[in-house]
Amino acid sequence: MDFNPVPPPRETLRAYLSKKGHVVKNWKLRLFVLKPGSSYMEYFVDETKEQQHLPQGRVPLYGTRVMEYVYNSNNNPREFCLSVETENKNWIISTGSKAQQLEWIEAIKHAIESAVETDEIKLQKHKSIEKQLQLDGKNKNKIPVLKLLLLGTGESGKSTVVKQMKILHHKGFSKEEEEFYRNLIYINLLDGMALLIHVIKENNIEIPQETLSAIKNYSSWYRVYIEKRNKNGIRNNPIGSMIPISILNNNKDNNNSNSSSLKNNSGGSSSSELDKKMTHLSLDGSTCINSNSASPNGPSSSTTTSTINTHNRSNSDGSSNNIFNVQDFGIPPIITNYISTIWSDPVVQSEVMLQAQKYHINESTQYYLNEIKRIGKPTYQPVNLDILKSRATTNGVVETDFNVNGEVIFRIVDVAGQRGERKKWINFFDDVTAIVFVAAINEYDQKLVEDNCTNRLHESLNLFDSICNDSTFPKTSIILFLNKIDLFREKLKRTSINICFPDYNGDQSYEKSSNYIKNNFLSKKKGGNGINSQNFIYFHFTCATDTKSFETVFNSVRDIIISKTLEFYC
């Protein structure tokens, strides 16, 4: 006999139902109450106890699944039963008819979808996990190592997750790491400004004369800086930076006669000639025009290669070469002034920045430019947020161990997300405890760097599809981080997700848009309907650069992973 689906209850659902005890024949009649929007289903001895709000027990609904409990004369002497299962316990409840059974199953399913994990549930779960680990004799003197595979497309925020783990469980970054990231931040900032100049030139964007003058001076300096940075190799260039070709190509000229458009006035000189001819800039920010000044490559101005002094990088011997040695001496004050002048132009912050999205500009560029006065100081040392915002392409595989509260070691394997790197993933699928998949939901209107054609969010969805349905790990838990919600909120103000999902007909609110994207990801899991098809997928909306919110998310993830793997250690 077919039954029509029961609509979600709009009012409290109440009924006397039988609950099975520890013994098959031990059934107790209880008054079950399910309120709309509640994260619990409560049961009482009778109406009096309900009025006094003295429940006999509670059935938590967060992370729970409900299904029909099939009648069997051996294991269940009653018909029309349903089973409500949590991670550690299950309830078998008998209803009075098939219609009532379906009504309660559907009502509980709808309640599960909106249920939230309360502090009480979190505390109970955490205590249960700690107790079981302490009682596990096999691991009394051994901390288990749980392997997490960190996957996702390029620039989704995977490496930022690892950085947050360092902050939370490695007591931050070492001096060597801070020095590396300081140089990386300089590169991100300087290359970001160069790309904005490239955008102005390519799109013939009109700008004020003051900004134009600062751009010309910055461009002249940047061309020599890049040549020297590339010559010095990895020490000065920890990433394979994509330099805008119009900044380096001195032969290309903009024929626009408008004085407010950007032109290249180098006259086809090589970088070495520019080095000799350009204005001699001193590190204290003064400008000294001296056509007879010695070449920076000469004996009197050799490149500084001594040990880095992070407390006094501005201490200079007066060599013109130091103006290009950003790693050892920081960004020269006069270059900082040029950058400030360019960035303070409203046209640059609005029209140019918007156009730059088409050129795959680093998402952190705006943040660094807003902080240019602080970053441009000779004594600059990066704070955690600066490091979290830094961007370098991950090549190959990076494994990092984190001891979490002495309970467990998480071995996070960060694998490069670019298309050409994904073939390496298969080598790390063995012994995987869980997969953490990071998807940048703000990329719904962006194209892949690899082909400048494929929509980034579609690429992420397709990749998630292939991973969560891979036969290599059919029962492996998958933690889905729907990342960069801060950038997603901002982008929604000007662009609807309809550009990526033509079938979407909702408004541009964060709640509806993010929920639609979430459902698109969860629907990729095959092998069942409803909640049963998502048994091993746990999702979180994240901002990986926000340490406080990320700590809350990771604590929840930690409990899920540990509880799911306890059986392997017991």
From Swiss-Prot:
Region ranges (G2 motif): 386-394
Domain PH: 10-113
Region (G3 motif) location: 410-419
GN (gene name): gpaC
Lineage start: Eukaryota, Amoebozoa, Evosea, Eumycetozoa, Dictyostelia
Regions crossing the membrane: none
Function per UniProt: Guanine nucleotide-binding proteins (G proteins) are involved as modulators or transducers in various transmembrane signaling systems. G alpha-3 plays a role in development. G alpha-3 mutants fail to aggregate.
Biased composition, class Low complexity, residue ranges: 254-272, 290-316
Subunit record text: G proteins are composed of 3 units; alpha, beta and gamma. The alpha chain contains the guanine nucleotide binding site.
Region (G4 motif): 479-486
Name assigned to this protein: Guanine nucleotide-binding protein alpha-3 subunit
Region named G1 motif: 147-160
Entry GO CC: cytoplasm; heterotrimeric G-protein complex
UniProt keyword annotation of Nucleotide-binding present: yes
SUPFAM superfamilies for this protein: P-loop containing nucleoside triphosphate hydrolases, PH domain-like, Transducin (alpha subunit), insertion domain
InterPro entries for the chain: Gprotein_alpha_su (IPR001019), GproteinA_insert (IPR011025), P-loop_NTPase (IPR027417), PH-like_dom_sf (IPR011993), PH_domain (IPR001849)
GO terms (BP aspect): adenylate cyclase-modulating G protein-coupled receptor signaling pathway; regulation of aggregation involved in sorocarp development; regulation of gene expression
Binding residues for GTP: 152-159, 388-394, 414-418, 483-486, 544
The entry's keywords: GTP-binding, Magnesium, Metal-binding, Nucleotide-binding, Transducer
